[in-house]
Amino acid sequence: MHFLVALLIGSIFGILFQRDVRGYGSSMGWGLGFGIFLWFFGPLTVFPVVGRQPLDWSAEQGTALFGSLVGYIIYGFILGTIYAFLDRIWVRLFIQSDPLNREPEGLGLHFLRSIEWGGLAGLVGGLVSIPVLAATGILPKIAGLDTSFGGIGGTIIHLFVSVGIGMTYGLLFRNEAPSIGLGVPWGFLFGVIWWYVGPLTLLPLILTGVYDWRASAAAALLPSLIGHLIYGGATAFTFLLPERRYKRWLLLDPRIAAREERRLRPVGTPAPALWFFALGLGVLLPILLG
């Protein structure tokens, strides 16, 4: 039954967001927003009705169900990533296999440029976020370091991790935004996603073997959420500088310019609504329920 429901939810995701997904990054963002919506729709509304229980939309009930909120967000993130992967396979086999629709650069060169720009952007984002993490006392505890050398060791590990995460940003969010104003919100969303996936899930699993999705645990990590937002915005801003310069060089070819024009999001795209919904609730819910 669980897998049938998951299949149905995945099909609904594809029907609703097919036109809005342009790559891995936007698909992950829509998955995050979809997961938050499912939490409101399922555990807070439909499940009590099916169980013939009174609806309880109080903050106390939300706090009690905070763990399921994180679970739905992680589910939406994974759903969006898998959907984008399958979509890219379809595009590669049935669209870009036509010589007229091939990308101007090969897959290997695209990968190398993405991780190069992303790694540099991640380093800048890591440097920019250091003051916030240090001021809130989070930096010495990065990767579980809590010794007299924790500050130095935490900073070094933080920068290495920032470079690695920046590389993933380059791979996932390349060609998602034509301008800095449209790209930085994607960076903020990327930071929120990594806060739920990293400090709230993966890091506890690596250190202790279990994760803690209680509202109290999220409240203790709120300072790092601010750091992740700053990191995401700075990473996106830095990444867009070489990406836009490279695009200006590509647009000198009229054929590539016409193709890039078709790939731009049309006026009236729902992406700003996603930023408002996912960023607003993704940040406010841990604050209000914690």
Model regions and ranges:
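Juxtamembrane/disordered regions of integral membrane proteins
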Residues: 1-290
